[in-house]
């Protein structure tokens, strides 16, 4: 005869392999706080509706508080034989308060119970991620304001393209993080409905108040369809999707840090706090933190892909496949959290090599577009013609191994006789970045204004939050 809490129907014990594949406590034990909170809300509602007595609800609440304290203090023994967090908590509750513990599961199934727990868990993840990204943005904006005048090369195809400011580059990631936060915040809005009370799939015949439990747990409303409530994990998928996009942004920045810290490039330095050495090469300073951020992106994207594959063929309602929704997601969320914190630390730590940045900004004829723009503005030349003329001038300079501003004026005039000495003034990298005053451009005054605006906005969020 089965000794399981669901075992009344069964006459034989599960096979040992069945026990092994069925158990989930190693993963869902991380839902203990959410499980206890949902159970307390459910018990209070049952009493308010006259389904259980007020005294039973009181004892259930006290017992659950004791269990919460035991788990928090590391004094709770999780038992694999009890399968999951729900049964572990209920079993311990029975030890503490006796038969009244058996009334807790009235009008509830593990199907709506776990859906509620996981929504609460993911909601906490969303809030923590939003706060971490806000701190990342603040660090970026602070450094951007500090480095608003620092000229560096801007790249396309990893080739020098046009001069930009380091502050402008950092502010690009502030904007990306803002969109990431928007996606997480939007996901939270759709997540924030309560499955509790949907029971196994069809609802319950007991006169429960789902609005009361939803309100108690901070949800906006109960989910409107009991089948939907227990059978979908789109809230996890949406969060992992937003997490994957965010991780890609972090990975791109991490890749830049890896490139920029290479002695062959040398645009920035990281301190010993975010680098490691080699076991054989004593001179090495490796940007391991950035490399690991880059790698952890795969963990996040892998979690999304894994859950998509789990869910893609499941008919309604609950299927045991959905027990596999948590481990990958939890690992993905943890990887993203660590990556955000590591990138925030590196942003605060990195030191720009100003001289090297300035020199690199002028390499590769990076101010050629400024010359083309001068031809358009001053000589009223169509841009396509100006592009062609400038390309010929760049070719002359390259053939002689000269920077653009080093090419004699006479040779420029051999290509376009109307070019004057005034054109030389636009060829410095400082002049180039200062001229990019269009909205969103790299001009230092733009960067300062944007960085200050973001710092003010983020500080206001801190005070309100």
Swiss-Prot record:
Keyword Amino-acid biosynthesis carried by entry: yes
Pathway where it operates: Amino-acid biosynthesis; L-arginine biosynthesis; L-arginine from L-ornithine and carbamoyl phosphate: step 3/3
Catalytic reaction(s) noted: 2-(N(omega)-L-arginino)succinate = fumarate + L-arginine
GO biological process, one term: L-arginine biosynthetic process
InterPro entries (alphabetical): Arg_succ_lyase_C (IPR029419), Argininosuccinate_lyase (IPR009049), Fumarase/histidase_N (IPR024083), Fumarate_lyase_CS (IPR020557), Fumarate_lyase_fam (IPR000362), Fumarate_lyase_N (IPR022761), L-Aspartase-like (IPR008948)
Keywords: Amino-acid biosynthesis, Arginine biosynthesis, Cytoplasm, Lyase
Name of the protein: Argininosuccinate lyase
